[in-house]
Amino acid sequence: MTTTLTLRLPDDWHIHLRDGAALATTVPHAARAFARVICMPNTVPPITTATQARAYRERILQALSDSKIADAEQLLARFNPRMVLYLTDQTSVQDIVTAANSGIVA
């Protein structure tokens, strides 16, 4: 008996999309290959709060929306970038609670 497992669209649990102009290249490639991605927060400056994570996620989705690729609209409908915080000595418990309650932080 043959059993098969088909991954229709995998997830990437450790991706570095970078920021700024690089998003125009990295985001469309990631959106075509993956359904969900966990975006590493080690940008410059690092993503350390829920507010920064939300802004970074918006830049990621905007980069996909602004891309000139033909299937950008379809990709936007299914691409789900999940955010994490870069923890530092200054990260407060409240920062973590706020991020956890934001709905966008993995």
Residue ranges and their predicted role:
Residues 13, 27-52, 75-88, 104-106:
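Divalent metal-dependent hydrolysis catalytic cores, especially in the metallo-beta-lactamase
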Residues 54-68, 72-76:
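Alpha-helix-loop-beta-strand connector modules within alpha/beta enzyme cores
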Residues 91-106:
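Extended substrate/RNA-proximal surfaces in nucleic-acid metabolism proteins
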